[in-house]
From Swiss-Prot:
It comes from the Bacteria. The lineage of its organism: Bacteria, Pseudomonadati, Pseudomonadota, Betaproteobacteria, Burkholderiales. Homotrimer. This is UDP-3-O-acylglucosamine N-acyltransferase. The active site is at H252 (proton acceptor). It catalyses: a UDP-3-O-[(3R)-3-hydroxyacyl]-alpha-D-glucosamine + a (3R)-hydroxyacyl-[ACP] = a UDP-2-N,3-O-bis[(3R)-3-hydroxyacyl]-alpha-D-glucosamine + holo-[ACP] + H(+). The gene is lpxD. The keyword Repeat applies. Pathway: Bacterial outer membrane biogenesis; LPS lipid A biosynthesis. It comes from Polynucleobacter asymbioticus (strain DSM 18221 / CIP 109841 / QLW-P1DMWA-1). GO terms for molecular function: N-acyltransferase activity.
Length: 355
């Protein structure tokens, strides 16, 4: 375990308090004990932080000044880690403690795995039971592929990527370094492409071969049961640093930029391009062939049916979506619609009486 000063130095925080103190983990403010670290990133919780039993708090400079001026019942002897972004610092400290108890995937190929002789698998990789690895697959160093995962022909998985059980990677899928792919994800299935060929008496939907691949950058996390379809003639691309929640559908030829977050049950239709640093709420949906500007925020359950060209905007609503501020005003009017109706009826009645 690292001492307080070692933690502060490793995570670029200023230390206030005893440098030699050692902590054994993290906990929320209401449950943290003297041997644990918690954090404060929202001024609304300052009073709770002051009264917390936590032995250390990760705080901003402004919150530190408040807590020192307003000490709680357990503040004596507390250590403070002062950071520009307490929430992000908490996340990095949490990663450190999580590594202490994380499973260790020993290098080697399980006897129940089926690996094509042409696959390139470094000795540092872990291949779990009942994994199937196809011809021409290339793995980087320290890749871990857990049980019952299917890796089809010519997939390329870069170093330090972790793939949980029961993931399906179709042929030609490319995955960057340090990615995490959770159970049940299906990457590289055919995109939903069919050409109509109908006449007055019948016809059919003609399948369009999906000959592109899926290309995933580095430091991407993909949630459980998420599906990312392969491109029709060009690739479906997920940019580096993006995080995708559970049960998200990403259709063929979609391009997701770098460092985007996409919450559960969102759906992005074919050939839509999402810019960098976008935030997409749960169950939001996008029509196809749109372009979404960088740093766009889309609220949950919002339907986007037109391209968004101005960066940094926040959209909310269903048919039509609109700027978030306009939606809030309209929602307030909608909540008071019955009162407005009653007032209009009264005005109409008074007008009739006067005439």
């Amino acid at each position: 375990m690292l001492t307080a000063i070692e933690l502060a130095n490793q995570f670029q925080a200023s230390l206030v308090g005893e440098a030699s103190t050692v902590f054994n983990g993290l906990a929320p403010l209401e449950r943290a004990q003297s041997s644990q670290i918690s954090f404060l990133s929202n001024p609304l919780y300052r009073k709770q932080a002051a009264d917390s039993s936590a032995g250390a708090l990760i705080v901003s400079k402004a919150d530190l000044e408040f807590l020192q001026a307003n000490p709680g019942t357990h503040s004596s002897g507390r250590v403070y880690f002062v950071a520009k972004n307490p929430y992000a610092t908490f996340a990095r400290v949490a990663q450190y403690f999580a590594r202490q108890s994380a499973p260790i995937y020993e290098p080697g190929i399980h006897s129940a795995a089926v690996v094509d002789p042409s696959a390139s698998i470094p000795a540092s990789c872990h291949i779990g039971p009942f994994v199937r690895i196809g011809a021409g697959v290339k793995l980087g160093e320290r890749v871990a592929i857990l049980g019952n995962t299917f890796v089809a022909e010519n997939c390329d998985i870069a170093s330090d990527t972790l793939i949980y059980p029961a993931v399906s990677l179709y042929f030609g899928t490319q995955i960057g370094e340090r990615c995490i792919i959770h159970s049940g994800a299906v990457i590289g299935a055919d995109g939903f492409g069919f050409a109509p060929d109908f006449s007055a008496t019948g016809g059919e939907w003609v399948k369009i071969p999906q000959t592109g691949n899926v290309v995933i950058g580095s430091d991407v996390e993909i949630g459980a049961s998420t599906t990312i379809d392969r491109g029709a003639m060009s690739d479906t691309i997920i940019g580096s640093g993006s995080k995708i929640d559970n049960q998200v559908q990403i259709a063929h030829n979609v391009v997701v930029g770098n460092c985007c977050v996409i919450a559960g049950c969102a759906a992005i239709s074919g050939s839509t391009k999402i810019g960098n640093f976008c935030i997409i709420g749960g169950a939001a949906n996008f029509a196809g062939h749109l372009t979404i500007a960088d740093r766009t925020t889309v609220s949950g359950n919002t339907s986007i049916i037109r391209s968004i060209t101005e960066p940094g905007q926040h959209y909310t609503g269903v048919y039509p979506s609109m700027l978030h501020g306009a939606w809030e005003k309209n929602a307030a009017i909608l909540r008071g619609l019955d009162k407005i109706r009653q007032r209009l009826r009264l005005l109409d009645k008074n007008k009739s009486t006067e005439s």
